[in-house]
């Protein structure tokens, strides 16, 4: 019964998030957290406690964002006080277009464990409630602790002390784009805008290009150009000023420039 209530709350939140004001959205978020606390359960993709490890509140906690969470506006919808988000490189993970959203009927970004791969990202400080809210946002992903040795700071001298969390899936759970679940241009815009925001804030000349280069399966054959009618729920008009730069980075190259071809080039 508790799981049904949580699922209903998440569904309502997702729908109302498009229609309500920031104040109403905050109220929805608070209600979600109350239900989680009351039920003493975690909303996880695998219904397993291992997918949502406990949070040690005696140390600082940080979330690593590598997709829409890189975008300060998108991130702020879930964690309002997360403007400070320094860039990092994360070793041992591959960023790939391979996570389907059933409600949105689209394919989003996913990080999978893969030795020998590195991707760029950001991190931001998060309270226990912030992490629970992000658990709800990333309900189909597992939250895992990333060893400090696998995180390289960029633009700042060193990493702060604490635990670093990231939302991932195993490769066996990857679901690739197709005609029914395309990549949304507006989601790619939100992701790449976050990369360019970080590039400007920390004066990193190629950070945006690195986002593209360390992301795999840019499947242009299954791509929905939805800028005239944005389909992504967390799309922000702020991305429009970055469009020319985004289009320069996401080159309209041959459809065969997919995951396999990019891997062969490594």
For the regions a protein language model found, what residue spans apply to each?
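Terminal signal-anchor or tail-anchor transmembrane helices
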Residues: 1-22
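A glycine-rich, hydrophobic/aromatic-adjacent loop/helix-cap motif
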Residues: 32-266
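Ser/Thr/Pro/Gly-rich low-complexity linker/stalk segments immediately outside membranes or between
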Residues: 20-37
């Amino acid at each position: 019964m508790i799981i049904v209530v949580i699922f209903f709350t998440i569904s309502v939140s997702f729908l109302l998030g498009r229609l309500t004001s920031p104040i109403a959205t905050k109220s929805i978020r608070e209600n979600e957290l109350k239900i989680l606390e009351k039920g003493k359960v975690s909303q996880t993709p695998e219904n397993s406690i291992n997918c949502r490890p406990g949070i040690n509140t005696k140390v600082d906690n940080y979330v690593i964002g590598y997709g829409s969470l890189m975008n300060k506006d998108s991130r702020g919808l879930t964690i309002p006080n997360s403007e400070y988000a320094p860039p990092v490189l994360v070793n041992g993970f591959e960023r790939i277009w391979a996570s389907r959203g059933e409600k949105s009927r689209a394919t989003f970004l996913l990080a999978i464990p893969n030795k020998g791969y590195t991707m760029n990202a950001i991190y931001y400080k998060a309270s226990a409630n912030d992490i629970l809210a992000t658990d709800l946002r990333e309900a189909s992903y597992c939250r895992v602790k990333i060893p400090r040795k696998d995180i390289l700071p960029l633009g700042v001298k060193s990493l702060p002390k604490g635990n670093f969390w990231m939302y991932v899936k195993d490769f066996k759970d990857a679901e690739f784009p197709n005609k029914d679940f395309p990549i949304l241009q507006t989601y790619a815009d939100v992701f790449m805008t976050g990369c360019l925001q970080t590039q400007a804030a920390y004066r990193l000349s190629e950070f945006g290009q690195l986002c593209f280069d360390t992301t795999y399966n840019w499947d242009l054959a299954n791509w929905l150009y939805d800028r005239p009618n944005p389909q992504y729920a967390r799309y922000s008009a702020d991305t429009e000023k970055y469009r020319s730069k985004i289009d320069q980075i996401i080159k309209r190259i041959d459809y065969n420039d997919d995951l396999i071809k990019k891997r062969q080039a490594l």
